[in-house]
C-alpha cells in the first residue's frame, strides 16, 4: 500500500531490501514517490503488476506480505502464483474479511499458520496470519476464529466476537418466534462464539 510497509521495515532494520507491487497506476506512482522521498530507491523496487506477478523466483524473495483486501481475494492471488511460492519461506497475510475461507485455502494447499495477531483500529478489527509451508489440520472453529487467536484470547479478539454476539442477539430479536429454523441458526452461531469466549449463556 504505497510502499509504506517496506519503507517502515527498512527504517527499523528488519529487512534488507524489498519489492513493492502495485496493481493500479495511481498507488504505483505514489509508492515510487514515497520510496524516493525516503531515499530508499536502492533498497526498494516498485513494480506495476498484479499480485505475485510482481516478482520472479530469481528475485529470491523470502517473505511475502499481502494486506488490506478480502480473504478470498488473497487466496485467489496465492492460487494464481502458487508455483512461485516454493522457495518463499513465510507469508504474512492480513485479510479484511472471510478469514475462515483464507485459512481453509491455506490448509488445503499445505500451508500452516504458525502465528496470528488481531488489532483494533477505528472500531474495525484486523487479523494477521503468519504462514509457512507444511501440513496442518484445523477444526471448523479454528478455521473461523483462528487457532492461535482462540487460544490467546487477546482483548481485541474478545471485543470483536463480543460485538458479533451483540449483533446476532439483535438479529434474533427481530426474527418471529414461529420462524424456528432461522432462530435456531442464529442461536447456534451465538452459542459457538460464547463457547470460544468461555462465556456462559
Predicted segments, located by residue:
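Short helix-capping segments at alpha-helix termini
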Residues: 12-14, 36-41, 83-86
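Hydrophobic packing residues within well-ordered alpha-helices of enzyme cores
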Residues: 5-9, 31, 44, 74-78, ...
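Class I S-adenosyl-L-methionine
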Residues: 54-59, 63, 72-201
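A structural signal for isolated positions on well-ordered beta-strands in alpha/beta enzyme cores
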Residues: 19, 45, 90-92
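Conserved SAM-binding loop of SAM-dependent methyltransferases across substrates and taxa
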Residues: 2-16
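Conserved beta-strand segments of alpha/beta enzyme cores
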Residues: 17, 43-45, 112
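Short glycine-rich anion-binding loops that position phosphate/pyrophosphate groups of nucleotides
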Residues: 1, 69-72
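S-adenosyl-L-methionine
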Residues: 21-62
Amino acid at each position: 500500500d504505497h510502499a509504506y510497509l517496506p519503507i517502515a521495515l527498512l527504517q527499523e532494520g528488519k529487512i534488507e531490501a524489498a519489492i513493492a507491487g502495485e496493481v493500479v497506476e495511481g498507488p504505483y506512482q505514489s509508492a515510487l514517490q514515497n520510496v524516493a522521498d525516503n531515499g530508499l530507491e536502492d533498497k526498494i523496487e516498485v513494480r506495476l503488476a498484479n499480485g505475485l506477478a510482481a516478482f520472479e523466483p530469481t528475485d529470491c524473495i523470502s517473505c511475502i506480505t499481502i494486506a488490506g483486501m478480502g480473504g478470498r481475494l488473497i487466496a485467489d492471488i496465492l492460487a494464481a502464483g502458487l508455483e512461485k511460492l516454493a522457495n518463499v519461506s513465510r507469508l504474512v497475510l492480513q485479510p479484511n474479511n472471510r478469514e475462515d475461507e483464507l485459512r481453509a485455502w491455506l490448509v488445503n494447499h499445505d500451508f500452516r499458520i504458525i502465528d496470528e495477531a488481531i488489532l483494533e483500529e477505528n472500531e474495525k478489527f484486523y487479523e494477521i496470519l503468519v504462514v509457512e509451508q507444511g501440513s496442518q489440520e484445523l477444526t471448523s472453529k479454528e478455521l473461523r476464529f483462528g487457532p492461535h487467536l482462540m487460544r490467546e484470547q487477546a482483548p481485541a479478539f474478545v471485543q470483536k466476537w463480543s460485538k458479533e454476539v451483540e449483533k446476532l442477539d439483535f438479529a434474533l430479536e427481530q426474527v418471529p418466534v414461529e420462524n424456528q429454523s432461522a432462530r435456531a441458526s442464529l442461536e447456534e452461531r451465538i452459542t459457538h462464539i460464547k463457547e470460544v469466549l468461555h462465556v456462559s449463556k
